[in-house]
Amino acid sequence: MTVVIKVGGARAVDPAGALADVASLVEQGEQVVVVHGGSTKVDETLERLGIDPEYVETPSGVVGRFTDETTMEVFEMAFGHLNTRLVAGLQSEGVDAVGLNGVDGKLLYGPRKSAVRVVEDGKKKIKRGDHSGTIKQVNGDLLGSLLDDGYTPVAAPPMAGSEARSASEGSSGDEPREQVIPVNTDADRSAAAIAGELDATLVLLTDVEGVYEDPDDPATLIESVETSEEWAALEAAAEGFMGRKIMAAEEALSGGAPEVVVADANADTPILSALDGDGTHVQASAVQEADQ
């Protein structure tokens, strides 16, 4: 079994239990890829530098970070710091962990979005200067080689963003040449893309037990989603940050992952418990039925 684990970056999430579980899975002979976020660390670093983080709302109602050039520099610094810490933590657990970002080997690759559609004061606008991208390809060969050699990849944004460069900007010949630059992308969706590429089970760890029918009532935990009707109910229940996780779940399942689990990062054994039935389990059949 191959498992992709998304470790969140929220203040309320302690990764210690997840790292121990990764070590247990690797010892059992399972192949594991760890993907981490870090938005909280980015915001904390921006605050120390006296810079206000900027979030924008898309016309579809999704709220996301606007990443200008300065924020992108902070992003690379913060994610690099977190990646090193997680790799060291896993190595302390006896795991041969290797740190990667999405630019390495074009692990996560796709077009850069320099302009985004946003809603400000009720009006739709085009906001330029964004450093973000959409993942179109995952270098599964790179991950497969590392896994087959006994390594545990620890991956994170930024991704390799592609944009055309004209001849006047340094390319030869008449045809534009690709320019690759590091750009921001969502960590949940990065994990989803990797899980889809590897046909792996995806575990999305967060600071709650799973998806609740009533977001304010943990007793309403949705435990299993297998049909299109249950999928529709899941989408309706997911609010705020959880909506982004369900979007990632759909992308993973559509891409080839057999199952996605949304589970509590702060459980005693968060990954092992999730694989054993805790959290919200979404099967590929739910998305396949919904697409028919």
Give the positions of each predicted feature.
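C-terminal catalytic "cap/lid" subdomain
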Residues: 2-59, 71-292
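Glycine-rich active-site loop/strand segments that organize a redox cofactor
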Residues: 60-67
